[in-house]
Structure formats: C-alpha cells, structure tokens
Curated annotation (Swiss-Prot):
Fe cation binds at C88, H130, H134. The keyword Membrane does not apply. GO terms for biological process: co-translational protein modification; translation. It catalyses: N-terminal N-formyl-L-methionyl-[peptide] + H2O = N-terminal L-methionyl-[peptide] + formate. It comes from the Bacteria. This is Peptide deformylase.
C-alpha cells in the first residue's frame, strides 16, 4: 500500500465539506488501506480522507484496540462532556484543550457496505468526533478553549 503525505494547514481542502461515498468499490477500498498505512506511519490515532487530499466522507481510527474504518460516518447522538488535550496530524506542533461529548452514538458503513451503529465513550468518542469534524471542514483549533505550541 501507499503512505501519503498528510496535508497541513492552511490548505483549503481541510476547510471544505467532504462528499458522501456513493459506491464502495476497489478505489474506495484502496483509499481506506492507504489511509490506514498513512495513519500508522504518522503515529496517529485517526485520519480523515481530506487529510490526504481526498474530499470524501471516510475515516480510519485506531486507539490501540482495533482498526475502525468508517464510510459516511454520522454522529447520531451525544451525551456528557469531556475536556481534554488534542493534537492533529494536519496542525503540527499545536495542542489544544477541546470540550467534546463523553459518549457518542455513531452510524456508518464498513468496507463491506454493512451498516454499523455503535456507542463510543471517552477516548474513542473524542477521536471519532475529531475525525468526523474533519469531514465538515472543522479543525480542533476551531473548537479549542486554548492552544499552545508543543516543542517537537
């Protein structure tokens, strides 16, 4: 598979709204595979397709449990609050404190076109919200209560 260069701010593609995937085909599966490889190579926990220059509604997430691939993901419900630090592969060197829902109900398709409906809490909920925000052209720095430069 291929490892893509992650697009960073101020690239306009990060501010656009991603388009729904209409058909799951070999090209979509290849993009998911490349997103996975890119996320792991960058030592990230999540990646959205716009971050590699593809304005489609696809994300990959792995917080150390299992790889989760979602096509056309949606957050159906949010509960509670959690305030925590976030960073982003597309906003290198910046960390911010962001208030997110503690629990989310998410719907999307897996790579086989099967619909997934599941609840996520804590870190997984935070990462899913962060990645789905990317599909709307929203970056964590837009929601951050405060930000700081992190020395690399």
């Amino acid at each position: 598979m291929s490892v893509y260069q992650v697009i960073t701010v101020p690239n306009d593609i990060l501010r656009g709204k991603a388009l729904p995937v209409k058909e799951i085909n070999a090209g979509v599966l290849r993009v998911l595979d490349n997103m996975r490889d890119t996320m792991y190579a960058a030592d990230g926990v999540g990646l959205a397709a716009p971050q590699i220059g593809i304005p489609k509604r696809m994300i990959v997430v792995d917080i150390g449990e299992n790889l989760l691939e979602l096509i056309n993901p949606e957050i159906l419900k949010q509960e509670g609050n959690q305030l925590g630090s976030e960073g982003c592969l597309s906003v290198p060197g910046i960390v911010g404190r962001v208030n997110r829902a503690k629990k989310v109900l998410v719907k999307g398709l897996d790579r086989n076109g099967q619909e997934l409906n599941f609840a996520a809490v804590d870190l997984l909920a935070k990462v899913l919200q962060h990645e789905i925000d990317h599909l709307e052209g929203i970056l964590f720095i837009d929601k951050a209560i405060e930000t700081r430069i992190e020395k690399l």
